[in-house]
Structure formats: C-alpha cells, structure tokens
C-alpha cells in the first residue's frame, strides 16, 4: 500500500499575490475541488507581520495540503499528501496562472507504507511503477 506526495516550489511569483490570504484560499479550494478531496474542518492560516508571508494548512480526510509563501523571495512552497494513489493536479499551469510564477518544480514521491507482498490479494503500485520523479513544468 502506498500514498503519493507532491512537493512543489514556484519561483518568480508576484509578491502581492503571495501576501493575499484570499488568493491562497482560492488555490486551496481549486486543488481540493479538482481532486475531490475532503477537508476536515477549516483551513488554518497564519500571516507573518514582518514579511507578509503566509503559512496555510488544510487537514484532509486523505491527509493534508500545506503552503508557505515567501513574498520577499517571490516563492511559494506547497505540499500535498494523499494516503492513496491518485492523479495529480496541474501545478505548473495553476501556479503560473494564479501567481504569475516564472518556474514551477514538482517532485512526486511514493510513500510506501508496507511492502506489497505483506498484504495478500492487494496490489499497490510499487516504487518501480511510480518512482520518485522530479520535473520542471
């Protein structure tokens, strides 16, 4: 059995969008809606007074969605973890559209909970099928 995690870095983002909780809220809503994820409670946000950067966390029935923004560097870091394999979200297109990101890097990790052979009758993608990958979109 395995889950999948996306670690995303967007660079060259518009600083003002990285300081806007409403913009980040729309991003979270879009990802959650598109992937049919199930939030558990309200997303929590913290804005840092000195830089305006924001940290956000949404607890999901499937695991979590988190972000950290660094407007002083024009960067946004996202982490989405789902405890079962699923299709990903188009982070490259979405982050370029919403935050005017100049570049987006996505690392996809398979989080292997147990060896597939330990669960009779269950076939889950192994590391050879969904190997950790990095790409720039």
Where on the chain are the PLM-derived regions?
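Polybasic/polar functional segments that serve as interface/processing modules
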Residues: 1-137
